[in-house]
């Protein structure tokens, strides 16, 4: 589902004859917006073994405490990145050249999705580490389906901004469902 979600937008952009220059700008925006999730990935890698161990020991309160603490830590460490990527998106894109300025709104939209991703914290790791991998798989497919459907409807009219919106909404939906499931 992750591969589908990360490939569908580019495939649908190309299928709708969005120019290769705009597809390149979109991919640059997705790569830059993922900077905001770098801390999430790093912390998740270190937290998952501890969560698995505590869950196996049925220490559910400690699992919850670590999940909440890591979510807060990830969010607050990521705030400066969010401020830069959203508040100064034109300047960030300008670093790649004047032709990339067209991607400033796209970058901001994608970064909003990453904000929610970090706020939700290690939800995927919690589901996988606690034996709910089938539920996580289903949630992932749900997110991929939302991504594809939104891309099909939004890209023809809104181009890369539509793809960014589809990406952000599917990421938000995926994270919110994971959070409520936990």
Where are these regions (language model features)?
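Helix-loop junctions and terminal segments of transmembrane helices
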Residues: 29-59, 64-71, 124-129
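Interfacial transmembrane-helix starts/ends
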Residues: 27, 59-88, 104-107
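Short helix-kink/termination motifs in transmembrane helices of multi-pass secondary transporters
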Residues: 3-12, 42-46, 70, 74, ...
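Membrane-interface junctions at transmembrane-helix termini in multi-pass inner-membrane proteins
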Residues: 111-142, 182
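Membrane-interface helix-loop junctions in multi-pass transport and translocation proteins
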Residues: 89, 93, 104, 131-134, ...
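Helix-terminus/linker motif at the lipid-water interface of multi-pass membrane proteins
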Residues: 3-35, 53-54, 90-98, 157
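Interfacial segments at transmembrane-helix termini and the short loops linking adjacent helices
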Residues: 20-22, 68, 85-115
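Residue-level recognition of pore/gate-forming positions within transmembrane alpha-helices
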Residues: 3, 31-34, 82, 114, ...
């Amino acid at each position: 589902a992750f591969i589908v979600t990360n490939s569908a937008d580019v495939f649908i952009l190309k299928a709708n004859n969005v120019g290769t220059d705009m597809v390149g700008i979109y991919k640059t925006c997705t790569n830059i917006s993922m900077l905001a999730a770098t801390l999430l990935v790093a912390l998740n890698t270190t937290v998952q073994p501890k969560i698995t161990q505590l869950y196996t020991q049925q220490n559910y309160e400690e699992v919850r405490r670590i999940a909440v603490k890591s979510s807060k830590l990830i969010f607050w460490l990521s705030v400066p990145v969010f401020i830069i990527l959203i508040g100064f998106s034109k300047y960030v894109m300008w670093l790649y050249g004047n032709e990339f300025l067209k991607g400033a709104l796209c970058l901001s939209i994608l970064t909003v999705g990453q904000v929610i991703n970090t706020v939700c914290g290690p939800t995927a790791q919690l589901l996988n580490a606690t034996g709910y991998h089938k539920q996580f798989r289903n949630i992932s497919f749900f997110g991929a389906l939302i991504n594809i459907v939104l891309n099909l409807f939004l890209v023809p009219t809104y181009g890369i901004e539509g793809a960014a919106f589809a990406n952000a909404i599917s990421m938000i939906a995926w994270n919110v469902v994971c959070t409520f499931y936990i």
